Amino acid sequence: MINIFCDVIDNFGDAGVCLRLGRDLCNKKEQVNLFCNDLETIKKIIKKDDTKNQYLKISLWPKKENSVELRDTVIQAFSVRLPEYIYSNIKKNKALVINLEYLTAEPFADDCHKLPSYSDGIESFFFFPGFTNKTGGLVIEDTFLKKLKNKNDLLKYQFKNKFINKDSYITLFSYENQNVNYILKNLTEFAEEKNKSFTIIVFEGKPLNNLNQHLNLNLSVGDTYKLDNLFIKVSPMVDQDEYDSLLIGSYIN
């Protein structure tokens, strides 16, 4: 049994990584409990197959020490701080604890991967995803590789007519960042230089809030806003399968 604890503090990023990891472990026939403290966020990116997966269970964090038995392995994603009753449960079951860290290409990942750590009376081990054979590597799903291989077909994919555009589309994903004005200005100049028009897909949540704030707009899901040669299209968040297709088929992300 592998138990993954996710604390959603970073839009869809934390939940997305944990979901991909859980799904990949299930593909290896591991039984996975994915505990998330924000089910509304994770529900927006799960695939239909996830809800039917007999190896994957997605639920809220347990509220009592004895409400779940954390056997075998516990993965703490991105320095998540767990309640004391969960640590007591871990100690009781003598589970292996892994601290999943953020993906980085920095050299320190080679040295820190698999290092032990001691906290709350529990020994845990750091797991650093990365790009060398001294790190934990990357989670790359088979379906993603197939889509990458068939990229030319994806370029023609219109996502059920959601994002029709005669030229090219760009996906814009951001957090609170005032540089969005600078990015749009440069994209406008680029579009004019190439004599092209671009559709920019902006997803609901923090990316849309950031855009509205810095452009003094009030866009919502389904709206389209014209900015010179750019057409800003607001989309609901899509599941990871469709998001992968969007990324692969887009002009730039």
Where in the sequence are the language-model features?
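Structural motif
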Residues: 1, 72-73, 96, 169, ...
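Charged active-site motifs of nucleotide-sugar-dependent glycosyltransferases
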Residues: 1, 165-170, 197-199
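Active-site and donor-binding regions of nucleotide-sugar-utilizing enzymes
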Residues: 5-30, 34-122
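Short, charged/polar "capping" segments at the starts of alpha-helices
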Residues: 39-46, 106-109, 178-181, 207-215
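Donor nucleotide-activated moiety binding/catalytic core segment of transferases
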Residues: 61-63, 201, 208-253
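A nucleotide-sugar donor-handling region in carbohydrate enzymes
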Residues: 102-181
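A conserved nucleotide-sugar
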Residues: 191-204
